[in-house]
């Protein structure tokens, strides 16, 4: 069985990602669980790096709710900018346009600017899948609707936004579900900085270490018998306030 090196919720922390990828052997399948962008200081560098890994090394990058919000803003900036701003979007807009992170943003005009300046990165985000299913694992950003008769009918929106109903639901998929989205320190009721994963007896593994909130960036290697190796890179400076 192929091994998978999985990373979740980088949120613009390019330096932490570079450090974590030093542990990747180049042979295992590299999988990103979404939320490459927003809140951190260098979303553009993260997007460019991961795009290169997808194009040149066969990495797989799933969409997270922040990529979902980014595209929603681009497609309808007048209606959607405020919601995106409240979720850390200004950091990404400024990063993509080469401006200081705290530069003022025009939510409508800058949408056109982003489309023109980084069309390749926008296209990259648009083609991100929402789920990766293997013989043993389901990789997804936020989770699945486990109340459905067929979990595969989970909407794309739920795949990137769901929280408690998934966390509290019973995993009867027959597979291990690996997800991010909700920082593990919330799920574990601990302070930011814990390097523990959230593990359940029914086969759910939460691995958003809250890197941009002063936590860690997890890299987990999965194989036939579960977790083979795990890495946790500590926050390297900037801590998001929102």
Show the residue positions of the predicted features:
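N-terminal active-site segment of His-dependent metallophosphoesterases
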Residues: 1-49, 53-55, 59
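Residue-level marker for buried hydrophobic side chains located in beta-strands
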Residues: 6, 30-32, 61-62, 138, ...
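Divalent metal-coordination and catalytic microenvironments
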Residues: 9, 35, 50, 64-65, ...
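Short, glycine/acidic-enriched loop or turn micro-motifs at the edges of active sites
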Residues: 11-12, 38, 68, 144, ...
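Short, glycine/charged-enriched secondary-structure capping and boundary segments
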Residues: 19-23, 45-48, 75-78, 153-154, ...
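Active-site neighborhood of divalent metal-dependent phosphoester bond hydrolases
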Residues: 39-129
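Acidic, His/Gly-enriched loop-helix segments that form or flank divalent-metal centers
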Residues: 102-216, 222, 226-228, 233
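Short, solvent-exposed aromatic-acidic interface loops
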Residues: 231-241
């Amino acid at each position: 069985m192929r091994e998978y090196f999985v990373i979740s919720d980088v949120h613009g922390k390019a330096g932490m990602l570079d450090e974590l990828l030093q542990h990747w052997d180049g042979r295992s399948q590299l999988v990103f669980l979404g939320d490459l962008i927003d809140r951190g200081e260098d979303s553009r560098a993260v997007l460019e790096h991961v795009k290169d890994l997808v194009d040149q090394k066969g990495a797989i990058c799933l969409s997270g709710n922040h990529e979902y919000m980014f595209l929603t803003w681009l497609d309808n900036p007048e209606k959607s900018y405020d919601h995106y701003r409240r979720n850390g979007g200004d950091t990404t807009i400024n990063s993509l346009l080469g401006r200081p992170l705290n530069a003022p943003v025009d939510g409508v005009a800058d949408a056109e600017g982003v489309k023109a300046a980084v069309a390749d990165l926008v296209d990259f985000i648009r083609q991100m899948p929402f789920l990766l299913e293997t013989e043993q694992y389901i990789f997804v950003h936020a989770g699945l609707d486990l109340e459905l008769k067929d979990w595969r009918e989970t909407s794309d929106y739920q795949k990137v936004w769901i929280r408690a109903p998934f966390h509290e639901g019973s995993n009867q998929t027959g597979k291990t579900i690996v997800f991010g989205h909700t920082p593990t320190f919330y799920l574990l009721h601990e302070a930011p900085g814990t390097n523990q994963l959230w593990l359940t007896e029914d086969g759910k593994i939460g691995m958003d270490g809250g890197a941009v909130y002063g936590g860690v960036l997890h890299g987990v290697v999965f194989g036939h018998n579960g977790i083979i190796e795990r890495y946790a890179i500590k926050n390297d400076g900037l801590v998001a306030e929102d």
